[in-house]
């Protein structure tokens, strides 16, 4: 074979060899290449799911709220949340039960204290976490957990990614009603309940927290009532009171602390009885609340117990977590320690303090 032909065959063979090697390398690279990110909707079963139990009466326009919550869920890799609106006939019990049956990872209560309490009653003891999206006037549990108010986006992020904290639940039987109810912050009878009853939703919608001030002025002229107080099986005590409150935590609106020793997770209920006389008496009591002094005034008494029974001489206005529930004469309380799991903001560590959460 002539040299030019040999040379040509050599060139062809070399080209074919190089081509074959290139193909093999390409196939190898293709085999070991890691898979790229997959769209979330390819494996929906693997994405965590939240349910939102929302009180629509707390919003003028609900659609932006829903859009914000959904946007946060999808941005954090969660499935689109279940959206369950409360009604006048069902303020959250059926909706929360449906959420549990759907196997959700967390239930977000979006509304006022009544919505939060109703959802908590269903979740207590289940281990399923409660997320708080404060949208009421009081927002008492959120205040006692140091949550930011009026921030649906931030609250949603905490509800989905925050730490879990087991808190106590107060349980209560009222008069002859066999159904046990729950409260998360405070419950009681007398002056405080009269304030809640005289601050209707329409007034709160117009003037906000000022509605409670107006209602308090209306209730100042009420009379004292006699109550029998029993705690943890000890001998009964009798008092004349204007109001008696049993608390799971102690902070009210405006930073006021009615029960400085109350803790959400100590397994104890705090009891405070207030019996001022006249305007000067109310001023003295108010001073004790403002200065957070637990002792030293004979018109303000504090106790702690796991079991508390209050029996009034006559039916008195009563309230649960700031919601009026009509009149009651006998209220039996017990502390259910650590019964409810709540999502709270993670504590700020030095590392987190420098983390802005985004690009510079």
Question: Residues of each region from the PLM?
Answer:
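Short acidic/glycine-rich loop or secondary-structure boundary segments that cap or lie
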Residues: 192-195, 237-239, 252-255, 279-282
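ATP/nucleoside-binding phosphotransfer catalytic cores, i.e., glycine-rich phosphate-binding loops
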Residues: 2-27, 231-238, 263, 273-360
């Amino acid at each position: 074979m002539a040299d030019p032909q040999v040379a040509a065959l050599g060139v062809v063979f070399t080209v074919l060899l190089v081509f074959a090697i290139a193909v093999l390398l390409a196939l190898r690279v293709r085999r070991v290449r890691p898979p790229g990110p997959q769209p979330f909707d390819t494996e929906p079963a693997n994405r965590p799911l939240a349910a939102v139990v929302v009180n629509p009466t707390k919003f003028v326009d609900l659609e932006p709220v829903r859009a914000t919550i959904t946007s946060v869920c999808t941005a954090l890799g969660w499935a689109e949340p279940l959206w369950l609106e409360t009604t006048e006939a069902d303020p959250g019990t059926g909706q929360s039960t449906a959420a549990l049956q759907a196997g959700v990872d967390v239930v977000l209560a979006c509304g006022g204290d009544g919505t939060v309490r109703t959802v908590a009653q269903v979740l207590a003891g289940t281990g399923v976490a409660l997320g708080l999206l404060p949208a009421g006037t009081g927002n008492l549990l959120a205040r006692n957990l140091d949550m930011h108010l009026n921030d649906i986006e931030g609250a949603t992020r905490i509800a989905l990614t925050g730490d879990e904290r087991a808190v106590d639940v107060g349980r209560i039987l009222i008069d002859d009603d066999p159904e046990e109810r729950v409260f998360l912050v405070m419950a009681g009878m007398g002056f405080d309940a009269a304030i809640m009853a005289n601050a209707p939703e329409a007034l709160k919608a117009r003037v906000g927290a000022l509605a409670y001030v107006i209602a308090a002025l209306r209730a100042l002229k009420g009379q004292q009532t006699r109550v029998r107080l029993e705690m943890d099986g000890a001998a009964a005590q009798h008092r004349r009171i204007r109001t008696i409150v049993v608390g799971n935590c102690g902070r009210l609106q405006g930073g006021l602390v009615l029960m400085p020793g109350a803790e959400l997770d100590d397994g104890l209920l705090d009891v405070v009885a207030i019996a001022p006389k006249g305007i000067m008496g109310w001023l003295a009591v108010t001073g004790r609340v403002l200065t957070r002094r637990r002792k030293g005034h004979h018109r303000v008494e504090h106790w702690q117990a796991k079991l508390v029974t209050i029996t009034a001489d006559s039916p008195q206005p009563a309230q649960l977590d700031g919601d009026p529930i009509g009149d009651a004469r006998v209220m039996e309380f017990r502390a259910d320690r650590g019964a409810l799991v709540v999502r709270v903001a993670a504590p700020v560590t030095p590392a987190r303090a420098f983390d802005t959460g985004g690009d510079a």
